[in-house]
C-alpha cells in the first residue's frame, strides 16, 4: 500500500491535537498549564514544560526550513532555547506559535511529492524519516510533560503537608 501524504499529515495532527489511540496529545497535555507551572523545574536537571514547548517549536521550524530547501541544523541555543519572558501572555504566544507551526508543517507535508519521501531532506535523513519522526518526537515530549505535571502536583502536596505550615493565615 503506498503511503499517502495525507496519512502522514494526519499522524502529525493526531500527535499534536488528539484523537489517537496512544494517549494524550501535546495540546491535551498542555491544556490548563499556567505560565508559572510551565516555567517551573520540578525535577532537578530536567527541562521545564515551557522549554519543551520551545524545543518542539524549534523542531517544527527545522523540518519546515528543510522542506523549503535549506540544509539546516539547529544550534544548541536553537534546539533548547531559554524562556525569554515568563508571563501569561508570553506563554500563550509560545503555545500559539507551536500550534501555527504544526499546522504549517501539516500543510507542507500534504503538498510534498510522495515520490521524494525516500530522498534526503536538508540533512542525512530522508523526508520520510523526518515527517514520521515529528509525531514520534512530539509524543516523546508529551510523555515528559505528563511526568513534569505529576511532579508539580506532588511538590504541591508535599508543601501543603509540610510540618509547621499554617494555612489558616493565607
Stretches with model-predicted labels:
Residues 83-119, 129-137:
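Acidic/histidine-rich alpha-helical segments that form the ligand environment
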Residues 2-23, 27-30, 35-81, 120-170:
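Short, contiguous alpha-helical
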Amino acid at each position: 500500500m503506498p503511503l499517502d501524504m495525507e496519512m502522514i499529515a494526519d499522524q502529525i495532527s493526531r500527535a499534536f491535537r488528539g484523537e489517537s489511540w496512544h494517549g494524550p496529545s501535546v495540546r491535551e497535555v498542555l491544556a490548563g498549564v499556567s505560565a508559572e507551572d510551565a516555567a517551573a523545574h520540578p525535577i532537578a536537571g530536567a527541562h521545564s514544560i515551557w522549554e519543551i514547548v520551545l524545543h518542539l517549536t524549534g523542531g517544527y521550524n527545522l523540518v519546515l526550513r528543510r522542506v523549503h530547501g535549506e540544509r539546516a541544523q539547529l544550534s544548541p541555543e536553537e534546539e533548547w532555547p531559554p524562556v525569554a519572558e515568563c508571563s501569561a501572555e508570553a506563554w500563550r504566544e509560545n503555545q500559539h506559535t507551536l500550534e501555527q507551526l504544526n499546522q504549517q508543517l501539516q500543510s507542507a507535508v500534504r503538498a510534498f511529492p510522495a515520490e521524494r519521501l525516500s530522498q534526503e531532506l536538508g540533512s542525512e535523513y530522508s523526508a520520510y524519516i523526518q515527517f514520521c519522526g515529528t509525531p514520534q518526537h512530539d509524543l516523546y515530549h508529551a510523555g515528559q510533560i505528563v511526568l513534569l505535571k505529576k511532579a508539580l502536583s506532588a511538590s504541591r502536596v508535599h508543601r501543603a503537608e509540610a510540618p509547621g505550615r499554617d494555612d489558616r493565615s493565607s
